Amino acid sequence: MNELAYLQTMPKQTALLKTHCADFVVKEQLGYEMSGDGEFVAVKVRKTDCNTLFVAEKLAHFAGIPAKNMGYAGLKDRKAITEQWFCLQMPGQPTPDFNQFQLDGVEILEVTRHNRKIRTGSLDGNHFEILLREAQEDADLKVRLENIKKNGFPNYFTEQRFGRDGHNLTQALRWAKGEINVKDRKKRSFYLSAARSEIFNLIVSARIRQGLHHKILVNDILQLSGSHSWFHADQKEDFNLLQQRLAQQDIQITAPLIGENVQIASDVENEIIAKHQELLYLMHQEKMKSARRPILMQAQHLSWSFIPEGLKLTFYLPAGSYATALVRELVNINE
């Protein structure tokens, strides 16, 4: 992450993140309400310093079902206070009495039924409440906050995506070179995700360094902010109009998540991907579907206050975007 370009400049201050779990609060928001009936038992949980997979296994064991019959919208940070939904597939079975469920760091907030499985893709986004300890109120930090509110921040994948010390990316590169064979399904998924996240980050960083993060290029693939559908900015388009729409946040410039049939739009993308052909080949070999992702992200409802302990932030991000990518534009972090 240190080598990736900043949208502003490298921060001047250093702050502490996640000194305590309460310094990093995440509340997920699904894209729908629970139906109240159906074959799935939906359980809303508040967990402190707990791994998502660990809690899922304990809930499944309590309900007497296989862990594979559990569902959730995504993995949440361990060193944090997080609220998220789990679902248990229990057709024709009564709802367990979760008042009897006991696990350190876990509180059951709500239990209901639902008519479909909660899975990746169910998540609309996450609300964040973050305390950056030891951050000092000064003019530079205030300008950074205002710039993020106005212009957004690089939509980088951050350290969580790459594993401890970049282990997932290292393993993906070894796999691509034929040095290892990966049989475990979850590891395969983690390694493939890390590999294409790395390519995405490099492309975003290159565009920022070249001053192209707010400039639409011929053949760029743009995303409509409302529907999230894509279209090509080919030579027939009115580029002055496209730039106006970009400034109004009606459209967004995207970069690729490489996979099968990846559409390479600009010379910047071509140049980066050409240097990582072994990873592109691995994506084809594993039949990963290609996708696109906005290169910049706008934090919704961003607000802040300086308190004696440091800087307190609250904001909302759509699914897939990382709060630590926003924080990176503000301060250097000691965890």
UniProtKB/Swiss-Prot annotation:
Record field: catalytic activity: uridine(13) in tRNA = pseudouridine(13) in tRNA
GO cellular component: cytosol
Enzyme class: isomerase
Domain of life: Bacteria
CDD domains cross-referenced by the UniProt entry: PseudoU_synth_EcTruD
Active-site feature positions: 77
All copies of domain TRUD, residue ranges: 152-308
Keywords for this protein: Isomerase, tRNA processing
GO biological process: tRNA pseudouridine synthesis
Gene3D superfamilies hit by this protein: TruD, catalytic domain, TruD, insertion domain
Keyword set includes GTP-binding: no
Keyword field contains tRNA processing: yes
Enzyme Commission identifier(s): 5.4.99.27
PANTHER family linked to this entry: TRNA PSEUDOURIDINE SYNTHASE D (PTHR47811:SF1)
Function according to Swiss-Prot or TrEMBL: Responsible for synthesis of pseudouridine from uracil-13 in transfer RNAs.
Family label: Belongs to the pseudouridine synthase TruD family.
Protein name as catalogued: tRNA pseudouridine synthase D
Organism: Histophilus somni (strain 2336) (Haemophilus somnus)
Gene this chain is encoded by: truD
